[in-house]
Amino acid sequence: MYENNKTLYLPYAGPTLLENALLNKGSAFSPEERQNFSLMGLLPAAIESITEQEERAYSQYQTFNDDMDKHIYLRNIQDTNETLYYRLIDNHIEEMMPIIYTPTVGAACEQFSNIYRRGRGLFLGYPDKGNIVDILNNAARQDVKIIVITDGERILGLGDQGIGGMGIPIGKLALYTACGGINPANTLPIVLDVGTNNTQLLSDPMYMGWRHPRITGQEYDDFVEEFIQAVKSRWPNALIQFEDFAQKNAMPLLNRYKDKVCCFNDDIQGTAAVTVGSLLAACKAAGSELSEQRITFVGAGSAGCGIAEAIVAQMIAEGLSDSAARARIFMVDRWGLLTDNMQNLLDFQQKLAQKSATVSQWNETGNISLLDVVSNGKPTVLIGVPGLFSQEVIMEMHAHCKRPIVLPLSNPTSRVEATPSDIIRWTEGDALIATGSPFDPVIFNEKTYPIAQCNNSYIFPGIGLGVLASGATRVTDEMLMESSRVLAECSPLAQNGNGALLPPLKDIHQVSHCIALAVAKKAVEQNKAPQRTEKQLLEKIESYFWKPEYLKYKRTAL
């Protein structure tokens, strides 16, 4: 009946036990448990295994044709029986990943108030400032080890979604568990409800958030500071992941807190790590080094610049000087190529701007366009976060680069710069591609091209597992670089010349294990974690890796 012989002693019984999603087993409660936990008559007579339950749940799932309906159905299982939820995802991860996260989660965030069923996590409203410590004590889960937090201002490519952004922390933490084996009992999604500037939400009678323009400036900073201090007091060893903060706040918050608490920003650092991992794999498949590439970005926000800085760091590790590495990076935004004579560049953009004297001849009549950059700079890599890749741009790139590396990273799918089928057709099948959203394999000239999804889920679950297992107190740039290196080593295309740039999702547990070990070892090496041998770290990682299995229950007094 039970795959795990461990016994759990519980004081809960009756409806209270059935309503606890972490403990509920539904029809899998044994006759003895039904008797001892006052469940007699509360469940149908059949005693089922989790395998039988999973088969029924999947059969029900298949009756839905609409992705949003599938998302709502899975979220309902998550809120009633988390063990079954993760068993279902484990067995169908490639099919269900796009449903529980991108691209479907984007629509779920937009419709959050309309599809709301029950609360999950914490909603920290600005009117509650001064009481955040007390609110954290209200959390249903007390042993919190990983927090994902958003303020809902920049949700995917969809902009300000207010508290609808809560769908992102919920989805990200589901992937921490499904991909990285983090016990769901140790996770907590949080949204900072500081208002919204989305007029549609403010006028929507169904909107469930605080109806107020967004708090900004010092008031905003003070509210975030109160949250950070409250977490340090309540869960001093928790890992905090910042998620989908607007550009004006994302980098400043990361810089303010990265050396004070164990935290990272997935949009900046996680996206950078998975992108560098994809590039390292592509370079290996093409028989070159990353330091040999010339890289153009379409989009010069915090995410794009974060990726660029990670690439610079890797190029330096391969032997280039800082200036030589930066000379190979071309950042293009809606005004054209970023150059050092432009006004109003943000701090993180200034370091990546090209010297105007070097590129002034590329367009003497105005701003330097993407096509100008491709024609004159002759990039071998094109990355969009987000942007627009036209046929003319891709074909011009292919004219001087036999195997161009093209990464259209925008999500959800509706926002992608160019589809893989177009890119493959425009390059006669020569392009190496990884996308931000999932795409089916492309058939061109009777050959099938699997499309890798450059998804942060390859990175952050392993980072979380490595941080928890090692007891790391910080997330360093070197730990993130290790995760990129390990991901590249897992690439099927780099290993044998066949397959996608990144490993299939069915192998995600193995990938997360490998990344976790590399991250943990680097944390120990940098004295950010207690000294442990590799064997001890492996044992820790295995002990932290939660599996969706039912345990035996014994009743104990309150």
Curated annotation (Swiss-Prot):
Keywords: Metal-binding, NAD, Oxidoreductase. GO terms for biological process: malate metabolic process. GO terms for molecular function: malate dehydrogenase (decarboxylating) (NAD+) activity; metal ion binding; NAD binding; oxaloacetate decarboxylase activity. Its cofactor is Mg(2+); Mn(2+). SMART domains: malic (SM01274), Malic_M (SM00919). A divalent metal cation binds at E243, D244, D267. Belongs to the malic enzymes family. This is NAD-dependent malic enzyme 2.
